[in-house]
Regions:
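Short N-terminal or domain-adjacent regulatory/targeting segments
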Residues: 53-82
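Short, highly selective alpha-helical patches that border small-molecule cofactor pockets
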Residues: 97-101, 105, 153, 183
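Helix-loop-strand module that forms the ligand-binding subsite of alpha/beta enzymes
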Residues: 122-187
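Metallo-beta-lactamase
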Residues: 1-64
Length: 187
């Protein structure tokens, strides 16, 4: 039995019959994600053990198909994209940047891309961070604001940096009239 503390945990109710991956990904990235190197080291040590059950502090006890869960943790802790796709993350003040980002998402989908739009002013920030790690590409769309970046995007970027965001292709959409500066800040 592996008592894994925060490892292999997930958000959600214990009694709920729900798919494990989405809430476990969000949990990993937002709770454990900064420690990918350490997780990789522990997974290597655990590889030689005969583990029949994983008991995390948060989430269900895992008893079957343990290889599936371990494979997810190997992927997440390596900071490699989990799947091919594009997150379009937007922070719009009056809706114009949002309209441009939604149009970009629509065009990407028309071209066959797996594109997901998230409005950083309204959507769950932890889910947006998890999606940034999930997909191999991210498009950041933000308005310039007081000589910098509109704060919801600034918060999103701070969270990504704090969780060691890496190994992704990033595109920028900047909106500004007389003093555009969001792209400079997003770099």
């Amino acid at each position: 039995i592996l008592f894994s503390a925060d490892g292999f945990g997930k958000f959600g109710a214990l009694e709920a019959e729900e798919e494990w991956t989405d809430e476990a990904r969000r949990y990993f990235i937002n709770i454990v994600g900064k420690y990918g190197v350490q997780v990789q080291g522990l997974l290597k040590k655990a590889a030689g053990l005969d583990i029949q059950m994983i008991c995390p502090l948060h989430g269900p006890i895992l008893k079957e198909n343990l290889g599936f869960y371990i494979e997810k943790y190997l992927k997440w802790s390596s900071y490699e994209p989990e799947e091919d796709g594009i997150l379009v993350a937007c922070a719009s003040i009056h809706g114009n940047t949002k309209a441009a980002a939604e149009k970009m998402t629509e065009i990407l989908k028309e071209q066959g891309a797996n594109a997901v739009f998230m409005d950083l002013t309204r959507d769950d920030m932890a889910e947006a961070v998890a999606n940034a790690f999930r997909y191999g590409k991210v498009i950041l769309a933000a308005a310039s604001y007081d000589g910098g970046i509109f704060p919801p995007m600034e918060d999103f970027l701070h969270r990504l940096a704090h969780k060691n965001f890496q190994k992704r292709t990033v595109g920028l959409i900047e909106n500004g009239s007389w003093a555009p500066c969001a792209a400079r800040g997003m770099k």
